[in-house]
């Protein structure tokens, strides 16, 4: 799944409230709203976003949990898509993610505790100033797999299969 990694802040002097995007469809968030209502009633705190703190009170905010900034399933056509298809997918992700943030901060059906928490954040008004304070780049986790003499798989990542002739090395947790 893909998302935009957002630069957010709680600094009231630098925070822009989450905008309600053009093309917003509240039905996209109905399942999330019901889920959060049930979880809140049961006393369960649901992780929604991963706020990695950065300098100047800003974040690199990414997906976290089963229902978050990833617009699950809407990226499938991207790897083989032509440019108009990719542009449509990028726009769908932008509208979804902006709508998600607006919903979490404003929809009266979202439990108040969550609305207050999410509403305390906003887009940093000194970032991406030429793009409505929204990141330019969709975060593409995966799109293509190189097929050759060797195809790297989870077995390689978990050291269940070791190659005798490596050409490079990297490290990152599997997600």
Residue ranges and their predicted role:
Residues 1-175:
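Flavin (FAD/FMN)-binding glycine-rich loop and adjacent Rossmann-like elements that form
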